[in-house]
């Protein structure tokens, strides 16, 4: 069983990718709370560990070249965020469905080729994994994306 912080990392990456793909190529403000859920600051006003980890995931995606942003709003959001070329192509790319197990894909051979292409796209698989709620499915898809 994976450590919970790693499972949260994969879920955050998947949610960030899904949200940025929906707005591509527009730049948006990406709020940590929209990805990780509500924050519960401590008595000193410091963000909870989960919130901080999500913000760090956003920064990590930028440092590794998957997203671009112009500035931060404290540790609460990134401003003017968009997918980079690397991030966009990773999400548009077709994944080998044989590599992934545990993700429900409607890969009917009788469907038109264009629909089959959609079902094999990385972003479709990210959305399906998030929809399933399965940590294992999310981990598989994100690991495969980050290896490309």
Identify the meaning behind each predicted range.
Residues 104-148:
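Short, cationic, amphipathic peptide segments
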Residues 59-75:
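A short, conserved structural fragment
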Residues 79-116:
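Short, amphipathic alpha-helical interaction segments positioned at domain boundaries
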Residues 4, 46-49, 71-78:
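Short acidic, glycine/proline-enriched loop segments that cap or flank alpha-helices
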Residues 2-45, 52:
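Short amphipathic alpha-helical interface segments
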């Amino acid at each position: 069983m994976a450590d919970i912080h790693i499972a949260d990392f994969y879920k955050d990456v998947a949610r960030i990718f899904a949200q940025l793909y929906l707005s591509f190529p527009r730049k948006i403000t990406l709020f940590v709370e929209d990805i990780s859920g509500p924050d519960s600051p401590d008595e000193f006003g410091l963000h909870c560990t989960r919130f901080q980890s999500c913000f760090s995931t956003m920064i990590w995606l930028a440092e590794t070249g998957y997203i671009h942003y112009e500035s931060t709003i404290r540790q609460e959001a990134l401003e003017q965020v968009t997918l980079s070329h690397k991030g966009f192509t990773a999400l548009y790319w077709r994944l080998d469905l044989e590599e992934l197990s545990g993700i429900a894909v409607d890969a009917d051979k009788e469907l038109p080729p264009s629909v089959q292409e959609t079902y094999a796209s990385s972003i479709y698989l990210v959305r399906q994994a998030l929809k399933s709620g399965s940590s294992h499915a999310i981990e598989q898809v994100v690991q495969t994306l980050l290896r490309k």
